[in-house]
A protein has these predicted regions:
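Specificity-determining recognition surfaces
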Residues: 1-27, 43
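Short, cationic motifs built from Arg/Lys/His that form the positively charged side of catalytic pockets
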Residues: 10-14, 34, 56
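Small-aliphatic-rich amphipathic alpha-helix that forms the alpha element of a beta-alpha
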Residues: 33, 101, 106-152
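Glycine/small-residue-rich phosphate/adenosyl-binding loop
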Residues: 42-116
């Protein structure tokens, strides 16, 4: 696919098959993230790939723990793929994904969040090229900036 086809084809997918992606595909996705544009060309992103189901679920629960669903009530996303906004029965911010990649940047760096999203977008495009589903999930600070989240780091 060319880049335009990738951009037009990529979708946020919130339902996943019950199997891990191939290690080689994961490595390609991570490499795509690491070559993303970033502030000052510093290449500061650190990507942590989690393939342990129980740990993915635990981090996903931390991700959603402080999320105020009520603030977005009525912001319907999709009946085919309900989001945490639409469906209060969803207990993990990662929707049961078998692999989760967390993107970290320097604390107190003005462009860390922008850099992380550029990295994540490259990863999503690479996943699409490989025929894999993905969804960009925010709230990284809320997930790890607390005692249980910090303990996982």
């Amino acid at each position: 696919m060319d880049i335009f086809d990738l951009m037009w084809t990529r979708r946020s997918i919130r339902k996943y098959q019950d199997r891990q992606i191939e290690r080689g595909d994961l490595e390609k996705i991570i490499q795509a993230g690491l070559c993303a544009p970033n502030a000052g060309g510093g290449q500061r992103a650190i990507i942590v790939a989690v393939r342990n189901r129980a740990l993915c679920e635990k981090i996903g629960r931390l991700n959603i723990a402080k999320f105020n669903r009520n603030s977005l009530a009525g912001s319907y996303v999709s009946s085919e793929q309900p989001s945490i906004i639409d469906d209060p029965s969803i207990r993990s911010g990662f929707y049961g994904a078998p692999t989760v990649c967390a993107v970290f940047g320097p604390k107190n760096f003005l462009y860390s969040v922008a850099d992380a999203f550029c990295c994540a977008e490259n990863m999503a495009l690479a996943a699409t090229e490989l025929g894999l589903a993905s969804c960009l999930i925010a709230r990284g600070e809320e997930t790890f900036d607390n005692e249980p989240g910090a303990a996982l780091l």
